[in-house]
A protein has these predicted regions:
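Arg/Lys-rich, positively charged N-terminal/basic patches that mediate binding to nucleic acids
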Residues: 1-34, 99
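Short amphipathic alpha-helical/adjacent loop interface patches that line ligand
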Residues: 17, 21, 36, 40-43, ...
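Generic structural signal for secondary-structure transition and capping sites
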Residues: 22, 29, 44, 48-51, ...
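Short, hydrophobic secondary-structure boundary micro-motifs
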Residues: 33-34, 54-56, 96
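Basic/aromatic recognition patch in beta-strand/loop cores that engages polyanionic ligands
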Residues: 41, 48-81
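Enriched for short, Lys/Arg-rich terminal
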Residues: 71-99
Length: 99
């Protein structure tokens, strides 16, 4: 049996998640927590399926699309460690530097 993978969130990814929650809460406060729960549940699936995201735009990363939401979780897999680098809206202009 494989070792349990560990997921960690970069500080900027945690801030991204907070910003997503705040933005959704502007129009639909009740939907904001549901959206965060959906994102976090999808990220937890990476423990079992670390390659489920497509190859990322940045070398060495993968991108997990969170459906039905339009958010993309950028992450890296290093052995049994999965680092969540960013959480971005699919339609937003991505920052010049992801990592």
């Amino acid at each position: 049996m494989a070792a349990q993978r560990v997921i960690s969130w970069a500080h900027i990814a945690e801030r991204d998640l907070d910003a997503i929650e705040e933005y959704i809460a502007l129009d639909k406060p009740e939907a904001a927590l549901d959206a965060i729960d959906t994102i976090e549940a999808k990220v937890q699936m990476l423990k079992l399926f670390p390659d489920m995201g497509k190859r990322g735009r940045v070398r060495g990363t993968r991108e997990l699309v969170v459906a039905p939401l339009t958010y993309v979780v950028v992450y890296r897999v290093r052995g049994d460690h999965i680092e969540i680098a960013r959480g971005l809206h699919g339609a937003q202009q991505w920052p010049g530097r992801i990592l």
